């Protein structure tokens, strides 16, 4: 004869209160990291956000494999879904590394390994090669010069820049191609080193994204396709 034992309501409420408090802290931290985890706000939060994104792939893959092992010969529906989720996660992880390596070969920028990065804008000024992550290839690119401070798409990239230091073109690299943006117009005040330059799409191909001082992309700048 078995007897049913009920859990006291007070104990249930106590456990729920503890779990609720813990999850409240975890979700609040996660919310702050996701909302303000941008490199222009805080490098610490940005690094924490990237660590979370990088850890999600192996964590989800491990959980899917464990679920498949636990569901084998027990629940075939759960087993099938676990195998499917493991395959999807593995494919996404492999695609991330392949696209990141392809983007790295074009830019040699560590932004290539940012899971949020789809494209990288590259510009050379004062002998420096500057890369900025962007979500996609824009129709046009604007460089703004304010009292010698160069802003690319609103981000400060260099100081002490003169009007004649502005490049003739900029590039946007994607995993599959590199888009060259030619300068088509500018308005400058040489005395105050203030003005702007506008670039539009000129051509695309298998080019190295690092711009050179000339205004023409030569064949020697082409790179081999990935094998």
From Swiss-Prot:
It comes from the Viruses. Residues 1-12, 64-76 are virion surface. Keywords: Glycoprotein, Host Golgi apparatus, Host membrane, Membrane, Transmembrane, Transmembrane helix, Viral envelope protein, Viral matrix protein, Virion. GO terms for cellular component: host cell Golgi membrane; membrane; viral envelope; virion membrane. The chain crosses the membrane at residues 13-33, 43-63, 77-97. It is a multi-pass membrane protein. Coiled coil: none annotated. Residues 201-217 are annotated as: Interaction with N protein. GO terms for molecular function: structural constituent of virion. HAMAP family: ALPHA_CORONA_M. This is Membrane protein. It comes from Bat coronavirus 512/2005. The lineage of its organism: Viruses, Riboviria, Orthornavirae, Pisuviricota, Pisoniviricetes. The gene is M.
């Amino acid at each position: 004869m078995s007897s049913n034992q009920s859990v006291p309501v007070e104990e249930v409420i106590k456990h729920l209160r503890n779990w609720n408090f813990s999850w409240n802290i975890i979700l609040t931290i996660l919310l702050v990291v996701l909302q303000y985890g941008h490199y222009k706000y805080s490098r610490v939060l940005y690094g924490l956000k990237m660590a979370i994104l990088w850890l999600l792939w192996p964590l989800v893959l491990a959980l899917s494999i464990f679920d498949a092992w636990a569901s084998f010969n027990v629940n075939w529906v759960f087993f099938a879904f676990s195998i499917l989720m493991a395959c999807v996660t593995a494919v996404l992880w492999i695609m991330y590394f392949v696209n990141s390596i392809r983007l790295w070969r074009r830019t040699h920028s560590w932004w290539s390994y940012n899971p949020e990065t789809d494209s990288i804008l590259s510009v050379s000024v004062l002998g420096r090669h500057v890369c900025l992550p962007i979500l996609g290839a824009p129709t046009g690119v604007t460089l703004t010069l304010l009292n010698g401070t160069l802003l690319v798409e609103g981000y400060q990239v260099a100081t002490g820049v003169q009007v004649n230091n502005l490049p003739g073109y900029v590039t946007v690299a994607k995993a599959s191609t590199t888009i060259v943006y030619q300068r088509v117009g500018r308005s400058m005040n040489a005395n105050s080193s203030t003005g702007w330059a506008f670039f539009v799409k000129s051509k695309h191909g298998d080019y190295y994204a690092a711009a050179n001082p000339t205004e023409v992309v030569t064949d020697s700048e082409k790179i081999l396709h990935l094998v």
